[in-house]
Amino acid sequence: RVEVTPKQGDGMRDVRGDVIRRQLKADHNIDVGEVRSINGFLVKSDIEKSEIALRVDDLFSDPIIEDVLTDSLFLSSAEQFSKTPDAAITIGFKPGVTDNPGSAAYDGFRTIFSQHEDRIDATISTYHTYAFYGLPESVTSEWLASTLHNNLIQRAVISDSAACAAAQWPAIDFPEKPPQILTPPQRMDLEISNEALISLSESGLLALNLEEMQTIQSHYRDETVRQERAAVGIVA
């Protein structure tokens, strides 16, 4: 695990955190005192952790404007995060979802460790953590997380104010891909409620909204379509 966060001090800005803070104000009229961000990288490799740790500044961070930490959470560092946040949320990709920043980091990883041709194969997954300070009491961490991520392709780990006070920080694990099991086509019942249609879209990784699912539902309700399917032996 490698974490990177913008340095604090005069002239230093947390650009990603500022963007989130401004978006909450612009989109929801919610004033937040401060938002700090952390970029995370989960690296799976046969190369020794100690060797990777020596090159993190070359690969994962800009040491002039960023601090970096390996195999630990920045939120656990009293030096870097001396104030306890009101909420902390970590967002990462679900297993099997394309992680473009992770792919870019892997390209750099292969270049830096090109001397290890026998151990160069690696996988890198990325995530973002946001720490919120001065959060209005009316704003729940669950609602906040819902505005920060797309639950079709991303997952969120949340620490509310009580968890933060107890130093129970959100830590996301490497998104291991589930084993591929090929199954024959199955008949799906589309005569279901709107809630069940959304659940079907999410569980099947269809990435379709309710209107799109209802369009599919209406298509298969069409009598002409049902007759054409029956004519070629497909269950109506």
Predicted regions and their residues:
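Core nucleic-acid recognition elements
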Residues: 1-236
